[in-house]
């Protein structure tokens, strides 16, 4: 059930409400929607290879209790947990809309697939710890009758983060928080670094932190396929198309400062079909904005950020596409099979790729050097000028590396504080966010999906309190800053 409320912690004199009271009323006729659902027998789909994605070009249903905008792992995870947790409540119709059915520009497929617990915020650490458990037990969560077990090709390997003298104190503080949250992390001095990793040049390194458990990398395509396969077996609908419009109703309410605000509710989603001028209207009760780098555009369709500047109604979702390059190189004299994922003091990073003396890595550009995100073309000069010099300094063997290939992908970059946006919008009361993770959305998707589903079904976060990631922080100017973003 969904309760009529104003959102948690609006501040600045607005009527406040806690997520735990979000149920019923205000055009969100949950009981009515659920009562319309007719039980259908879904045939169990056999498994297919991880790189084969099913056709989803058919029309969406005319009504769906929940419409998930975005079919990457974050959107799929929300859909999975909605179906998994609502077993106690009866049937729920869920539709996932994805405009790029090949996932050629999706952040999921272009990710390097890493998972790490070495964050500065307890919430991010908790999310990644849960994700590690989810991935380790993937076939308990995503098993499908008559389908072969999933193999995520997980490579257990710690993350090795290097800190300069000016960042050493912050690293010590971060590791203390990580240990308090249950992460297995240790600090290493330069001498300890040289003993364990003799191929590292420790010049400029004052301290390092090293993950000893639940870190590594995996195949994001197999996770994507496994989620889609499981969701289809659970009766979730998929549609290839683009969301172009929301039909809403509104209601005016007074704040405690005698200021009028407009509450909106989305009743209908218009989906433009691929290669067509036609659109299909889908009646709905809930919309999940998991559109990744383009989630701000979806939010704007609902009027978010269209009000006067400085007001809650005028507060935009601060998420935009940022292009990031990944380079793959060959170096027979490189560090070898025991190479962790290394994050250098310069911001450059690298890890082993496979067993053939190949490595991959990159570096986030400086703010003033951000590349044009209009396309996914690779800037090879960026590697030569901004990445390779740091790699060769840290690992002298990399002076002779040869670049083999490269690609570019998108971060759903939160320009406000580089952290995720999770939960309901305070004024568009039935739009929920799962976006803005700025590069760590893939690894935290299982926990984020569960949190959003809990908020919808229970009215509050149940397992991990992600209240610091609510939308209202943008209006209040209260940053939830994560310091460890690569």
Curated annotation (Swiss-Prot):
Cofactor(s) needed: FAD
GO cellular component: mitochondrial inner membrane
Subunit structure: Associates with components of the mitochondrial respiratory chain complex I.
A Pfam family reported for this protein in Swiss-Prot or TrEMBL: DAO
UniProt organism field: Macaca fascicularis (Crab-eating macaque)
Cellular localization per UniProt: Mitochondrion inner membrane
Disulphide bond pairs: none
Gene Ontology MF term list: oxidoreductase activity
EC number, as in UniProt: 1.-.-.-
Signal peptide range: none
Name of the top EC class for this enzyme: oxidoreductase
Protein name: FAD-dependent oxidoreductase domain-containing protein 1
Example of a GO biological process term: mitochondrial respiratory chain complex I assembly
Keywords tagged on the record: Electron transport, FAD, Flavoprotein, Membrane, Mitochondrion, Mitochondrion inner membrane, Oxidoreductase, Respiratory chain, Transmembrane, Transmembrane helix, Transport
Role summary: Required for the assembly of the mitochondrial membrane respiratory chain NADH dehydrogenase (Complex I). Involved in mid-late stages of complex I assembly.
Protein topology in the membrane: Single-pass membrane protein
TM regions (residue ranges): 66-86
